[in-house]
Amino acid sequence: MPRPGAESKNSTNMVGIVVVGHGRLAEEMVRTLEGVLGQVDALEAVVNEPADPGERVRARIEEAARRVDRGRGVLILSDMLGDTETNQALAFAQTSGAEVVAGVNMPMLIKLANARKQTDARALAGLLRRYGQEHIVWATEAPAVVRKAQ
């Protein structure tokens, strides 16, 4: 996981990213992303325990958002719609202007790491939704994908 608030000379003027999910899922997704791309600035995972009350989850999201904000807004990615983490992210978004996308997957994170200097959080949320959906594939029913793998 990147160090909280990690900054470099290249980390200004980009969309800040907070990944939130059940248990340690967000932390592991960020760790995997950084295993592929190296350290990603202005990116933070929020870890929640099953017994954490909603207020504690929201406080962690708020703190992480403050640390990753680099001037182009904050995008919060959650694991699924309707859970405590997403609901608390949405409550925070109502007062902060952050954007929230539920249903995060690895292709979305990789795209995000490479596209967030080119746009703002709202436009990036729309791009990620489309990109994430395009990369959910019934692989055994996609012969071209299977042939490429062989």
Give residue spans per PLM region.
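N-terminal loops that bind phosphate or other acidic moieties
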Residues: 2-150
